[in-house]
A protein has these predicted regions:
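N-terminal chloroplast transit peptides
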Residues: 1-36
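HotDog/MaoC-like acyl-thioester-processing domains
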Residues: 3-6, 11, 40-101, 190-198, ...
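Catalytic strand-loop segment that frames the active site of acyl-thioester-processing enzymes
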Residues: 53-144, 251-253, 257-344, 461
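Active-site helix/loop of acyl-thioester processing domains in fatty-acid/polyketide metabolism
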Residues: 143-171, 343-367
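A cross-kingdom feature marking solvent-exposed beta-strand/loop segments within repeated
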Residues: 169-198, 364-388
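Eukaryotic modular interaction domains in large regulatory/scaffold proteins
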Residues: 324-380
């Protein structure tokens, strides 16, 4: 039996972005493309098929100069007036309280924005500036996906600040934070460490206090940028003290294509509501799902005894309780965001790395990320928190591994645990993996939830 229950202490080694903007020069040719040829056909087909089901954003690049990736965080600090030194953070947040008077009383008082008003391009010059590769390089000589999650989170916030920018305000009174990662679908398996990367994105839907942001990542090869992933984030605007919702500028379409994108954003909102309403934490499983759970139960009964308690693991299977990894993080000031709480991108990176390790241990081979979906930021993580992470394989099918990572903060004084995030990752392995088998009712609900997420992802790719 493969036992994966391991508790580990993982340290923080995240570098703060220094905000220096080296000159952008043409990219060097991409090297080492032989990796893709070694893939089994099922992996190659799955991870190069592209994403579907979402409208293609119109070209908005004309007249926009790209931003160096190292300048994104520094721009955010300038927009909100954040301190670069931890010892000054209390004073900086006190100064933001005075910005309350700049908040709009009604959304109708704010000027409408177009999609192209928030459009941004960010360059990650891994090919043309080799000195920045070290931060992004993994042991397999490809780009660390966790670092990409950090960059996407920062870019999404900057796009929203661009959408809500008021010309007469030197500092924004809004506190814009990530509320949800709706989905990230990858159409390439390998992100090469020696080819330039370009991120693009803009606001694609607006509520009264929330904004949906669509972002795309492309990588340069043979003189052309080819798609790597599409991402949809949902951001919320709060007051300067991050206590109450704040109104944001409405979004107006200029073309029929943009009208469809806004309609899709509204549909995405309704889908999220429906998915939440049907959650297994609120509603009983469907009749079909109950039959699935009962079949699993019957298949694990020991036929040599007439007992409901005697269970036997089927061939080529792993008990769910033996398919998990755990980790602990001490949240240092180095990992804070512009509002002096722990950076959401950092949380996503750590959760992904634990999820990847869980899938790697389970499948006994290198897994590749296929999709990220439904990451809900339920509460902020304060600096100094003890962050507990638990990665669980909750569903498998052929080469696919569905991993759920649960994140919670632990208060050592009160000994209370509070959930902060739940992450869902879909991986694909080079080989077919054993079937994960739930034993308890709670594990069966995790199994069904993982099955639901996996089915939703398979419709997208």
């Amino acid at each position: 039996m493969l036992l994966l229950q391991i508790t580990r202490l993982m340290c923080f080694h995240c570098l703060l972005e220094h905000g220096v903007s080296p000159a952008l020069v043409p990219s060097q040719p991409c090297l080492g493309l032989s990796t893709m040829r070694k893939l089994p056909s099922v992996l190659a087909r799955t991870l190069t098929s592209g994403t579907s089901g979402s409208p293609v954003l119109p070209d908005m690049s004309e007249g926009h100069l790209p931003i160096h990736v190292n300048n994104v965080r520094s721009r955010l600090r300038d927009i909100v007036g954040a301190s670069t030194n931890w010892r000054d953070h209390v004073q900086a947040m006190q100064e933001r309280k005075a910005l309350h008077t700049l908040l709009a009383k009604r959304q109708e008082d704010l000027p409408p924005r177009r999609m192209k008003d928030s459009y941004l391009e960010v360059i990650l010059p891994l090919g043309s500036q080799p000195e920045i590769r070290e931060k992004y390089l993994n042991v397999h000589n490809s780009v660390r996906f966790g670092r990409i999650l950090e960059d996407l989170d920062s870019l999404g916030v900057l796009i929203c600040y661009t959408h809500t920018k008021q010309e007469m305000q030197p500092r924004s009174p809004l506190s814009i934070v990530t509320a949800l990662v709706d989905k990230i679908n990858l159409c390439k398996k390998i992100i090469y460490p020696d080819c330039d990367i370009k991120f693009t994105g803009n606001v694609s839907w607006v509520g009264r206090t929330s904004m949906e942001v669509k972002m795309h990542m492309l990588q340069l090869h043979d003189g052309d940028y080819s798609p790597v992933l599409d991402a949809t984030f949902v951001m919320v605007a709060r007051d300067p003290e991050n206590k109450r919702p704040a109104f944001v500028n409405p979004l107006v379409p200029e073309t029929p294509e943009e009208e469809e994108i806004i309609k899709q954003g509204e549909l995405n909102k309704l889908k999220r509501i429906d998915f939440s309403t049907a959650s297994l934490l609120k509603m009983a499983p469907t009749a079909e799902e109950r039959n699935i759970v009962h079949d699993i139960f019957l298949n694990t009964l020991d036929t040599r005894t007439v007992s409901f308690r005697s269970r036997k693991l089927p061939p080529n299977s792993v008990w769910m309780e033996d398919a998990k990894l755990k980790g602990l993080q001490i949240c240092h000031p180095q990992e804070r965001n512009i509002f002096n709480r722990i950076f959401g991108g950092f949380l996503m990176r750590k959760a992904f790395e634990l999820g990847w390790a869980t899938a790697c241990s389970y499948g006994c081979s290198r897994p590749f990320i296929v999709s990220v979906d439904d990451i809900m930021f339920q509460r902020p993580v304060e600096v100094g928190s003890l962050l507990l992470l638990s990665g669980q394989v909750c569903y498998t099918e052929k080469n696919y591994i569905q991993v759920r990572v649960h994140s919670e903060v632990y208060d050592a004084d009160t000994r209370e645990h509070q959930t902060t995030n739940i992450f869902h990752f879909t991986f694909i392995s080079e080989n077919e993996v054993p079937r994960v088998v739930p034993k308890t009712y709670g594990e069966s609900m995790l199994y069904l939830d993982g099955k639901r997420h996996f089915a939703a992802i398979m419709k997208e790719i």
